[in-house]
């Protein structure tokens, strides 16, 4: 892999991360925020794979597996919270679960 290819992959990874963060901040539905968070986590995962391929070592693949494991745990906890909130509040709007009164 050349330096130009690495740069392209890093730009793509940064774009995925930025799109995910924008989705988390812009959407009000909890389920859409979870999906956007998964997109945001795929950015660093792609960066780990690209950096590992550029340097020719397997540490990038190990970090990718760690990122996938973290993302799977996040989805499991997030979906459980989503179902609990939807049953309790009757809505999937993130503003509905705010405990602040005012």
UniProtKB/Swiss-Prot annotation:
Organism: Rhodopseudomonas palustris (strain BisA53)
Coiled-coil region list: none
GO biological process, one term: ATP synthesis coupled electron transport
Transmembrane portions of the chain: 6-26, 30-50, 63-83
Entry protein name: NADH-quinone oxidoreductase subunit K
Membrane topology: Multi-pass membrane protein
Species lineage: Bacteria, Pseudomonadati, Pseudomonadota, Alphaproteobacteria, Hyphomicrobiales
GO MF assignments: NADH:ubiquinone reductase (non-electrogenic) activity; quinone binding
Family: Belongs to the complex I subunit 4L family.
NCBIfam families recorded: PRK05715.1-2
Gene expressing this chain: nuoK
Record-linked InterPro entries: NADH_UbQ_OxRdtase_chain4L/K (IPR001133), NUOK/Mnh_C1-like (IPR039428)
Pfam families the record matches: Oxidored_q2 (PF00420)
Alphabetical keyword list: Cell inner membrane, Cell membrane, Membrane, NAD, Quinone, Translocase, Transmembrane, Transmembrane helix, Transport, Ubiquinone
Subcellular location: Cell inner membrane
Function: NDH-1 shuttles electrons from NADH, via FMN and iron-sulfur (Fe-S) centers, to quinones in the respiratory chain. The immediate electron acceptor for the enzyme in this species is believed to be ubiquinone. Couples the redox reaction to proton translocation (for every two electrons transferred, four hydrogen ions are translocated across the cytoplasmic membrane), and thus conserves the redox energy in a proton gradient.
Mitochondrion is among the record's keywords: no
């Amino acid at each position: 892999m050349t330096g130009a290819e690495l740069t392209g992959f890093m730009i793509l990874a940064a774009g995925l991360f930025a799109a995910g963060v924008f989705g988390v901040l812009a959407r009000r539905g909890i389920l859409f925020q979870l999906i956007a968070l998964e997109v945001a986590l795929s950015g660093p995962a792609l960066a780990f794979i690209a950096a590992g391929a550029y340097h020719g070592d397997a540490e990038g693949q190990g970090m990718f597996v760690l990122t996938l494991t973290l993302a799977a745990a996040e989805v499991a906890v997030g979906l459980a919270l989503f179902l609990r909130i939807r049953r309790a509040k009757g809505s999937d709007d993130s503003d509905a679960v705010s405990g602040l009164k005012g």
